[in-house]
Amino acid sequence: MIYIITVFLAGNPDDSSMSAYFMDRLKNNFTITYLNNGLVRQIGKGPEILLIEEEKIISENINNAVIVFKRDCTPLLSGKFLKENTVIISSYDKSNLKKISGQNIETITCGSSPKDTVTYSSSDDETIVVSLQREITSFTNKAVLPFEMPIKRLCDDDYNILAFFALSVKIGFTEKNSL
């Protein structure tokens, strides 16, 4: 059975900092098919990830996907998300959190609050220690219990690192696979 993980990066498609970081981190373990503004690019080797950068999200048409809201994004949302999806969002994004609140969808918040699903406990110029605060069920239906893990700081945006870590946990690419 061929299984493709679909990931939408919601927000301005001209801001490619998140997609560049995600692709760079995943390309050694996954085949990534990247779609953005008519551009199609494929890199890497391994299980398939479809990475779509899009400003307009027609949520009722998306099924079994991860929707990652970019920092400071204003995606054009249409409809309610289906419960089989997962949203990864900054806890500082109050506007979009309000739009998805009350929907029966797994929401993973990322930020510096102890209430966030994914946060960090320490940070320096080279490493950020990321923390999963609550259990997440991966796409393989494996319960991933809270844990901490140091990650090399390969980008300057802490939210991109936290969102990548959340996605990694969701797709089963966790502590056994060095990030």
Positions of the model-derived regions?
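Intrinsic-disorder/low-complexity, polar/charged segments
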Residues: 54, 93, 153-157
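Short, low-complexity, polar/charged sequence segments that are solvent-exposed and flexible
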Residues: 68-72, 86-88, 107-109, 126-130, ...
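Adenine nucleotide phosphate-binding catalytic loops in nucleotide-utilizing enzymes
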Residues: 112-179
